[in-house]
Regions:
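Domain-level signal for soluble alpha/beta catalytic cores
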Residues: 2-384
Length: 384
């Protein structure tokens, strides 16, 4: 007899779901080819969009076949999981620094964002337009269209970290606190616009907390000798200020990430150093947490999550195609219940499959096999 047959669990009708996804999917070869042609001026934007629309429609159909409850557009219109959103705001420029982001054994493409004016939301933001198309594909179905965006704190850190960033800020802002306020407001306005377009399921992707949790890396984010605690207070405020006075039927969750690029990682360390801030105080309904390797630490920080909030355990890696041992995952879920109620736990892969257009090193078949395993295990545990 399975655990689901002996216990009664809350029926999930909104995110997070017992078997869930983080959101990005491997880009099809057709889409990659179209993006390359667009970059080389061989096709125009309308032709690229037609390919994007076709690939997103096919992806939504595959997600429906996988019996996912909340579906995404796979982030197929983005090059990066975060920068495209930043570039969509007024007052933020696309820059090409000397170096990309440094991951374990690999350096990314060199793209970034920099202040070039007062930061404001505008009604033509690409994430808003992308969501409208996704919703059109789910209208008349039971599928919930989910929009993922990088967290406000992630945007702020991108704008303040790096050579020449402080000078750019000083041209338009009297202080970084003023900048932070505008970032939160721009995000708040984007979120409300998404809501007006029909979004009821929003996920914030956030690598800032994964970086601050790393004992060897957090100081990179600290400004002017700032302590780890003050840094966390600052970033928590930026995120929470964007989430004030939102409609009650908008479900907001967050994915606390350690970096995901071409199957490599950026930071390491358990969630303990940041648990008292992000896990205890961020105004979201659920936390998608990475627990696919020893780098993630133990489950003890889950005790800081308020009892009424959900934790999605990212126990299956999205960085490789090898399937996890089923019993190992079942045992780890049981271990997590020492710190958070089983009824408030769900299961997913640790991250998306393609945080950037390069994608992780696995096949599409392996990607869907991972999701199928997540679903199968969740059904055994919760009867999902």
């Amino acid at each position: 007899m399975t655990q689901a047959q002996t216990l009664t669990f809350t029926n999930r009708t909104t995110s997070p779901f017992r078997y869930d996804i983080v959101g990005s999917f491997l880009r099809p070869a057709e889409l990659k080819a179209a993006r390359e042609k667009f970059a080389n001026h061989e096709i125009d934007h309308d032709e690229l969009k037609a390919v994007e629309d076709k690939c997103i429609k096919a992806l939504v159909e595959k997600q429906a076949q996988a019996e996912l409850h909340a579906v995404t557009d796979g982030e197929f219109r983005r090059s990066w999981w975060h920068l495209d959103t930043f570039w969509g705001f007024d007052g933020i420029a696309h820059t090409n620094p000397e170096h990309g982001y440094f991951f374990h054994d690999e350096e990314t493409r060199a793209d970034s964002a920099q202040v070039e004016g007062k930061i404001r939301f505008n009604g033509t933001h690409p994430d808003l337009e992308a969501f409208k198309y996704l919703k059109s594909l789910t209208d008349g179905t039971d599928l919930i269209p989910r929009q993922s965006i990088p967290a406000p704190a992630q945007c702020y850190e991108e704008l303040v970290l790096g050579e020449g960033k402080s000078e750019a800020i000083a041209e338009f802002y009297s202080s970084k606190a003023e900048l932070a306020k505008d970032v939160s407001q721009a995000y708040h306005d984007l979120i409300l616009a998404l809501y007006d377009a029909g979004c009821r399921d929003l996920k914030l992707d956030d690598c800032t907390w994964g970086s601050i949790a790393d004992d060897e890396f957090w100081h990179v984010f600290a400004e002017d000798g700032q302590s780890r605690e003050l840094l966390q207070e600052q970033l928590l405020k930026i995120n929470n200020d964007a989430l004030v006075n939102l409609p009650a039927d908008l479900v907001v969750t967050t994915h606390v990430c350690r970096g995901n690029y071409h199957s490599t990682w950026a930071t390491k360390g358990g969630y303990g150093p940041v648990a008292d801030y992000v896990l205890a105080k961020e105004n979201v309904a659920a936390f998608y947490l990475e627990y696919d390797s020893e780098r993630a630490g133990g489950f003890e920080p889950l005790a800081k999550v308020p009892a009424d909030k959900y934790v999605v355990l990212g126990l299956l890696t999205s960085k490789s195609g090898e399937l996890e041992d089923r019993q190992v995952i079942l045992d780890r879920i049981q271990e997590a219940t020492q710190y958070h109620d089983l009824d408030k736990l769900c299961l997913s892969t640790q991250c998306g499959f393609s945080s950037t257009e390069e994608g992780n090193i696995l096949t599409e078949e392996q990607q869907w096999a991972k999701i199928a395993l997540v679903k199968s295990i969740a059904e055994e545990v919760w009867g999902a």
